[in-house]
Regions:
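Generic start-of-chain signal for non-secretory N-termini
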Residues: 30, 35-48
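Non-cysteine beta-strand/loop elements that form the S-adenosyl-L-methionine
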Residues: 66-72, 137-138
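N-terminal active-site wall of soluble small-molecule enzyme domains
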Residues: 102-173
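Cationic, amphipathic, low-complexity segments that mediate targeting or membrane/lipid association
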Residues: 1-32
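Structured alpha-helical segments in the cores of large, soluble enzyme domains
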Residues: 57, 90-97, 142
């Protein structure tokens, strides 16, 4: 049985609801064609798909995703999956997404230890140079560095923001 996620983020500071899906097309097509039933405009949400290979990237686009999120190499929570992108793939992914009118979100959502800081800087710098839409981060070192070089940051679910006080705190980097 495949897992599906269909969730609207309702925190007041969010201007867009985010729908994420794991089975290409089904929920994406439902959301795109039936959003009025949910009392929403199409611009109120974004359909995101996790990708870890060129095949899944193409499937996300064919399935109607507005955006993809992906990790590269070691500093993301999906790094132990059997297929993963490399730093050399980053620019090509970003360009492909731009050409196909998709947003690209790079996950840098692991704990950053002291020995990881230089490597994290190189990944965030490469994301900026490649014009990735934003990074998804959980560690304060990543969040602060990305903001210091004007890279848009989205707070990862790894941060476990579960109340309005935490939301207000992290909103300063939104």
């Amino acid at each position: 049985m495949e897992k599906h996620i269909f969730r609207q983020k309702s925190a007041p500071i969010h201007k867009k609801a985010v729908f994420s899906y794991f089975k290409c097309g089904e929920i994406a097509n439902f959301a795109k064609t039936n959003h009025h039933i949910l009392g929403m405009q199409r611009s109120d949400f974004e359909i995101m798909a996790p990708v870890g290979s060129w095949e899944s990237l193409t499937a996300a686009w064919q399935g109607g995703a507005d955006a993809i999120y992906f990790g590269i190499e070691n500093l993301n929570m999906r790094s132990r999956s059997s297929v993963n992108f490399t730093l050399d793939d980053l620019h090509t992914i970003a360009v492909w997404c731009q050409e196909h009118n998709m947003k690209s979100y790079l996950t840098v959502n692991t704990i950053i230890y002291e020995e990881d800081i230089e490597y994290m800087h190189s990944i965030v710098n490469a994301a900026k140079e490649a014009k990735v839409t934003a990074i998804i981060a959980s560690d304060m070192a990543t969040i602060l560095y990305a903001r210091s070089i004007d890279v848009e940051v989205h707070i990862s679910t790894q941060v476990n923001v579960s109340n309005s006080e935490a939301m207000r705190y992290y909103a300063q980097w939104a």
